[in-house]
Amino acid sequence: MFLKTESFEHNGVTVTLSELSALQRIEHLALMKRQAEQAESDSNRKFTVEDAIRTGAFLVAMSLWHNHPQKTQMPSMNEAVKQIEQEVLTTWPTEAISHAENVVYRLSGMYEFVVNNAPEQTEDAGPAEPVSAGKVFDGELSFALKLAREMGRPDWRAMLAGMSSTEYADWHRFYSTHYFHDVLLDMHFSGLTYTVLSLFFSDPDMHPLDFSLLNRREADEEPEDDVLMQKAAGLAGGVRFGPDGNEVIPASPDVADMTEDDVMLMTVSEGIAGGVRYG
């Protein structure tokens, strides 16, 4: 994984800021969601300047972690980030935290968050409902799980840890602009194919999804016993059941003394064009 980096200088001190990984991007959204939930649960609590500074320090600490000595000294990334966050809060001025936070946002492509399944606003619609941090986090996490499933990666956290934030955003953009567009095209052409073929083949079991390349219909379940009995009522020879499934219909006199194999051969040969044909 190659992360974008940029030197950040403040008051003569230079550090290296890195683009966040996709996993860090999700963890940052999780922090914002927790803060929003705490604010909703306590009507008297508001998002203060202290919260903004701590959120910025957390974001900067995650960025510094990629090139910080604590990365190899601490057993886990979360513990190392906590140590770096305390270092930022105690040694950095608030102005530097704010500027560095903006750099990390820019490097990671996190100025705009995409929410899955966001309803389109029409001209007659009222003011758009504000997108909460919880909705953004849920949308991003849902997409991350879908992406892991598409890539065959059962551990979605490991997948995101090895992916940059901009790479994750590129996948998000690709699926939003191409994959879902392909789904709409597939629906259109499968429906068109179904309409055309239904004019020539009056098959009640035919379905538009039979012609879909992206969403194949699952195999039909085994027919029930009564359906099998109804189909068996039309067989010539062998054990034959009536439509009610109870009464056994005896074989016709002309084939009563013949074996089952002979009767089956006669049945099949009725449709042969040319050669020996039986009535």
UniProtKB/Swiss-Prot annotation:
Q: Which UniProt keywords apply?
A: Host cytoplasm, Late protein, Viral release from host cell, Viral tail assembly
Per the UniProt record, the source organism is Escherichia phage lambda
Q: Name one GO biological process term.
A: viral tail assembly
Q: What does this protein do?
A: Promotes tail assembly by creating a scaffold for the tail tube proteins. Tail assembly proteins G and GT probably wrap the linear tape measure protein to create a tail assembly scaffold. This allows the polymerization of the tail tube protein, during which G and GT are released, therefore they are absent in the mature virion. The tail assembly protein GT is produced by a rare -1 ribosomal frameshift. The ratio of translated G/GT is about 20, and this ratio is important for proper tail assembly.
Q: What is the lineage of its organism?
A: Viruses, Duplodnaviria, Heunggongvirae, Uroviricota, Caudoviricetes
Q: One matching Pfam family, short form?
A: Phage_TAC_2
Q: Which gene encodes it?
A: T
Q: What is its quaternary makeup?
A: Interacts (via C-terminus) with tail tube protein. Interacts (via N-terminus) with the tail assembly protein G and the tape measure protein.
Q: Where in the cell is it found?
A: Host cytoplasm
**Protein name per the record:** Tail assembly protein GT
Gene Ontology CC terms: host cell cytoplasm
Similarity comment: family membership: Belongs to the lambda-like tail assembly protein family.
